[in-house]
UniProtKB/Swiss-Prot annotation:
InterPro entries noted in UniProt: Sec-1-like_dom1 (IPR043154), Sec-1-like_dom3a (IPR043127), Sec1-like (IPR001619), Sec1-like_dom2 (IPR027482), Sec1-like_sf (IPR036045)
Function of the molecule: Involved in intracellular vesicle trafficking and vesicle fusion with membranes. Contributes to the granule exocytosis machinery through interaction with soluble N-ethylmaleimide-sensitive factor attachment protein receptor (SNARE) proteins that regulate membrane fusion. Regulates cytotoxic granule exocytosis in natural killer (NK) cells.
Organism lineage: Eukaryota, Metazoa, Chordata, Craniata, Vertebrata
Gene that this sequence comes from: STXBP2
Superkingdom as given in the UniProt entry: Eukaryota
The protein's assembly and partners: Interacts with STX1A, STX2 and STX3. Interacts with STX11.
Name of the molecule in the record: Syntaxin-binding protein 2
Keywords, alphabetical: Disease variant, Exocytosis, Protein transport, Transport
């Protein structure tokens, strides 16, 4: 499946703006990258795309490399001390340099001292290109971005890192500005009123964007572009969503299974022996894209249905008994191994999720939903929430982190509990080793303890929804309400102030060009969006249920709006709790991601 949305835009920017810009017919080049730029490139380009553009080898600047003095090198690097020193070192050797010449592309603005150092080095004699491409984020999915900065939560919210806070906000602001510039957006910027950080970050992004606008006056131009908005909100607005056991396919799999770097590993039984398979869960897999936001109850059904349709299209008869026995189908259709393996992977993944669900997760889901909603499946208000949680806390079979998730949901429902009550709950749950993790929710802006036993909340209240849902999936992330209000122009301007005056809304009713619709081709040949975008940035990590909301709201506008969401990093419930755990520790006592 070809990259779409954000991935396509970034991939095209690298291929056209970097590699093709220095390409000469019949000439091969070497591509050198560091770890951050390698992560950006691999998130949106295949190695075959790179090699097809006259690149003979791709190398890591921090690893030992064989000199190729007959070829020119393209350097795609983040502008850091380490990478710049490694670059200079490539052109210090005698009698020959590592490469014939250098085309240097920095992912972001190169600090003046490093720039001066480059100018003083021997490298200056062989530099043919030197550009800053302003690409300081990862396109994680078509509508999801990551700043690849999981450590930023610690820098922003740990009391021991107070002196780092302003610098960290400046770095994040620059990264968000590069996202807007890459998308050709100059959005109106709004923030959730209350926390100091959201206002500070919003003002910093505006300053960085204004600098981009001064360099590129056409940034954000277009009849519909004046409606684009960037919303900045904090994790305290909805601390519930990252704690819940979600039952949609992607969120559930990443919560319950050991998926690392988006890779799912599972055992397959071949004709002779079992072997491990590793499968990347990404948008190259169209089946994953179709299934990832579906409820688990519908996933296996859907895969089986798609598999049956596929078999029938190849004139292979199937029945209920053999449709899941893929090894039998494979024997009859070995030429379709690639397609059948895809179905096999997703059946495995769904079965794996269901095994965990049928274990202890099912009963946890019911308790969590009642606590999150404040009411039961019938809509009756929860009168005794303590009665709900005690069986979970006392159950030795429930893992510590699952107990903590329930405990935090209880505390959030109550808007804090008394110190005495908290101590008892921690003791009942036997999670004394994690008591600071629970208290650290306060650092993010949540209320954990209150002398009176119940306090006020900084959370946004979810709106009541009428659409039918599964009993164990009643909760809707609050961010979805915010997105819907933003695209309908219903967001309260007092609660969500603008950092600069929004553009006049007369153009909001302007007809989109009948010739181009909401898309037009830019110079690079990729489709650029002419309609408005809503970009949502969540400080402190974004949950997978919130990622799903961006796609749902986009779909509901029938393509009139495109909603993008992102953060410093993508959260799973375990990741969220690990982030909380670090917030009262000194730097030397933790291992930052």
């Amino acid at each position: 499946m070809a990259p779409s949305g954000l991935k396509a835009v970034v991939g095209e920017k690298i291929l056209s703006g970097v590699i093709r810009s220095v390409k000469k017919d019949g000439e091969w080049k070497v591509l050198i990258m560091d770890h951050p730029s390698m992560r950006i490139l691999s998130s949106c380009c295949k190695m075959s795309d790179i090699l097809a553009e006259g690149i003979t080898i791709v190398e890591d600047i921090n690893k030992r490399r064989e000199p190729i003095p007959s070829l020119e090198a393209i350097y795609l690097l983040s502008p850091t001390e380490k990478s710049v020193q490694a670059l200079i070192k490539d052109f210090q050797g005698t009698p020959t340099f590592t490469y014939k010449a250098a085309h240097i592309f920095f992912t972001d603005t190169c600090p003046e001292p490093l720039f001066s150092e480059l100018g003083r080095s021997r490298l200056a004699k062989v530099v043919k290109t030197l550009k800053e491409i302003h690409l300081a984020f990862l396109p994680y999915e078509a509508q999801v971005f990551s700043l690849d900065a999981p450590h930023s939560t610690y820098n922003l919210y740990c009391p021991f890192r107070a002196e780092e806070r302003t610098r960290q906000l400046e770095v994040l602001a620059q990264q968000i500005a590069t996202l807007c510039a890459t998308l050709q957006e100059y959005p109106a910027i709004r923030y959730r009123k209350g926390p100091e950080d959201t206002a500070q970050l919003a003002h910093a992004v505006l300053a960085k964007l204004n600098a981009f606008k001064a360099d590129t006056p056409s940034l954000g131009e277009g009849p519909e572009k004046t409606r684009s908005q960037l919303l900045i909100m904090d994790r305290a607005a909805d601390p519930v969503s990252p704690l819940l056991h979600e039952l949609t396919f992607q969120a559930m799999a990443y919560d319950l299974l050991d998926i690392e770097q988006d890779t799912y590993r599972y055992e397959t039984t071949g004709l002779s022996e079992a072997r491990e398979k590793a499968v990347l869960l990404d948008e190259d897999d169209d089946l994953w894209v179709e299934l990832r936001h579906m409820h688990i109850a519908d996933v296996s059904k859907k895969v089986t249905e798609l598999l049956r349709t596929f078999c029938e299209s190849k004139r292979l008869t199937t029945d209920k008994a053999n449709i899941k026995d893929l090894s039998q189908i494979l024997k009859k259709m070995p030429q379709y191994q690639k397609e059948l393996n895809k179905y096999s992977t997703h059946l495995h993944l769904a079965d794996d999720c269901m095994k965990h669900f049928k274990g202890s997760v099912e009963k946890l889901c019911s308790v969590e939903q009642d606590l999150a909603m404040g009411s039961d499946a019938e809509g009756e208000k929860i009168k005794d929430s303590m009665k709900l949680i005690v069986p979970v806390l006392l159950d030795a079979a429930v893992p510590a982190y699952d107990k903590i998730r329930v405990l935090l949901l209880y505390i959030l429902l109550r808007n804090g509990v008394s110190e005495e009550n908290l101590a008892k709950l921690i003791q009942h749950a036997n999670v004394q080793a994690h008591s600071s993790l629970i208290r650290n929710l306060e650092q993010l802006g949540g209320t954990v303890t209150n002398p009176g036993g119940s306090g006020t909340s900084s959370r946004l209240e979810p709106r009541e929804r009428m659409e039918p849902t599964y009993q164990l999936s009643r909760w809707t992330p609050v961010i979805k309400d915010v997105m819907e209000d933003a695209v309908e122009d219903r967001l309260d301007r007092n609660l969500w102030p603008f950092v600069s005056d929004p553009a006049p809304t007369a153009s909001s009713q302007a007809a989109v060009s009948a010739r181009f619709g909401h898309w037009h081709k830019n110079k690079a040949g990729i489709e650029a969006r002419a309609g408005p975008r809503l970009i949502v940035y969540v400080m402190g990590g974004v949950a997978m249920s919130e990622m799903r909301a961006a796609y749902e709201v986009t779909r509901a506008t029938e393509g009139k709006w495109e909603v993008l969401i992102g953060s410093s990093h993508i959260l799973t419930p375990t990741r969220f709790l690990d982030d909380l755990k670090a917030l009262d520790k000194k730097l030397e006592d933790i291992a930052l991601p």
